[in-house]
């Protein structure tokens, strides 16, 4: 498929954020300034006493699941398509309900595709609401590598300040167009989520909190760039083969006028 080029890259980005948040990378890096070794907070060791929950187990989510298992964690997964995916993955994924997913977990990784259609059973704007995350039975690390709209920043920041979230790693933001424009002086941080996103970004950059951010670049590996270039050439060839009217596989985020 023409959409497979970045599966491993995005999955590895999720694991990078897991290591940063669990390892409290900002604090440990800043401690080097004075070579402080006595007052550091203990980091979260990844082992089989810790549980991670993966939300959304398509190709990328499945790879995230595998990498978390390879790091010694207990892993569970939440996906509305669990029945069909369980068969597809030969019963190798521990699927649980949405309610079970948040309980007794230490690390939450969002890998769901965004569905904005309210009538769809897959609708997930605001899925990780403050109310849902408060059902966690212990403080969690929160990782998001697909779409910011699924996990509004204002709720994440509030829960972090309340000690319910221990660290945030995100490659995505709720309104990336407005956020980018505001960051570049062409707009205002005029919503709770934009203000929270700015605070998370600022504190990630000055290393004052356990926050780690990227500007939607989780797919940007060296290998993925090569694979995407190959896919682009194949796509162009298909276009001309079909008389400039269609591709063999129409990607959902491209529309033909």
List each language-model region with its residue ranges.
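Short, charged, surface-exposed secondary-structure boundary motifs
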Residues: 8-12, 85-89, 177-181, 223-224
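Short gly/ser/thr-rich secondary-structure transition/capping motifs
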Residues: 32-38, 87-95, 122-125, 150, ...
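Mid-domain beta-loop-alpha active-site segment that forms a flexible
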Residues: 5-13, 59, 65, 220-236
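Phosphate/diphosphate ligand-binding glycine-rich loop within oxidoreductases
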Residues: 1-32, 44-45, 142
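Rossmann-like dinucleotide-binding domain for NAD(H)/NADP(H)
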Residues: 139, 146-257
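Rossmann-like dinucleotide/phosphate-binding beta-alpha-beta segment
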Residues: 42-138
């Amino acid at each position: 498929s023409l959409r497979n080029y970045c599966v491993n890259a995005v999955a590895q980005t999720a694991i990078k954020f897991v290591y940063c948040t669990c390892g409290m990378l900002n604090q440990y890096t800043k401690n080097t300034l004075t070579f402080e070794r006595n007052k550091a907070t203990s980091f979260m060791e990844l082992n089989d006493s810790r549980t991670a929950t993966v939300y959304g187990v398509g190709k990328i989510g499945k790879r995230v699941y595998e990498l978390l298992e390879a790091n010694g964690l207990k892993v569970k997964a939440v996906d509305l398509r669990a029945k069909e995916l369980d068969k597809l993955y030969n019963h190798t994924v521990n699927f649980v309900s949405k309610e079970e997913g948040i309980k007794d977990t230490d690390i939450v990784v969002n890998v769901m595709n965004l569905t904005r259609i309210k009538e769809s059973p897959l609708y997930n704007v605001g899925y990780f609401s403050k109310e849902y995350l408060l059902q966690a039975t212990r403080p969690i690390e929160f990782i998001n590598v697909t779409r910011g709209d699924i996990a509004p920043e204002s709720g994440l920041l509030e829960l972090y300040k309340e000690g319910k979230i221990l660290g945030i790693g995100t490659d995505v933001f709720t309104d990336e167009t407005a956020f980018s424009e505001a960051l570049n002086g062409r707009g205002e941080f005029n919503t709770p989520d934009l203000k929270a996103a700015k605070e998370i970004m600022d504190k990630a950059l000055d290393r004052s909190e356990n926050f780690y951010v990227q500007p939607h670049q989780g797919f940007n590996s060296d290998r993925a760039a090569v694979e995407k270039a190959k896919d682009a050439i194949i796509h162009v060839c298909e276009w001309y083969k079909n008389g400039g009217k269609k591709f063999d596989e129409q990607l959902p985020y491209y529309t033909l006028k």
